[in-house]
């Protein structure tokens, strides 16, 4: 690890990786690393900004974590094929990624 890497980590709360597989059916995994413990909100939205699913919400320890989306909405109903946004928020930092569900 270089000094630049260490400085970047000091200013970051987390690193969010691309989901895998993508496109996916029936489920996908999204990996993220928290550089320090804290509250996490991890949600899935459709392209109109409507909440589809809550993947994780609550206090998490520093380290690597996995969130799994099974392609279902908050009511347990399978979401239709399409592009969805996953958004991780923690410690004042927020990042969004895109994923494609194919039915």
What are these regions (language model features)?
Residues 1-20, 24-45, 54, 69:
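Glycine-centered coil/turn sites that cap beta-strands in beta-rich domains
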Residues 25, 36-38, 61, 73-75, ...:
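Residues that cap or initiate secondary-structure elements
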Residues 67-79:
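Signal that preferentially marks extracellular ectodomain short beta-strand elements
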Residues 52-53, 79:
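Generic structural signal for well-ordered beta-strand positions
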Residues 27-29, 39, 64-66, 83, ...:
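Intrinsic-disorder/low-complexity, polar/charged segments enriched in Ser/Thr/Lys/Arg/Asp/Glu/Gln
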Residues 2-4, 59-62, 77-103:
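C-terminal tail/sorting-segment detector
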């Amino acid at each position: 690890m270089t000094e630049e890497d260490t400085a970047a980590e000091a200013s970051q709360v987390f690193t969010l990786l691309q989901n895998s597989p993508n496109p996916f059916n029936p489920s996908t995994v999204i990996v993220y690393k928290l550089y320090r413990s804290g509250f996490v909100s991890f949600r899935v939205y459709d392209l109109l900004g409507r909440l589809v699913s809550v993947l994780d919400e609550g206090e998490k320890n520093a380290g690597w974590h996995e969130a799994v989306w099974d392609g279902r909405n908050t009511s347990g109903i399978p979401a239709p094929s399409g592009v969805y946004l996953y958004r991780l928020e923690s410690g004042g930092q927020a990042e969004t990624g895109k994923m494609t569900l194919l039915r």
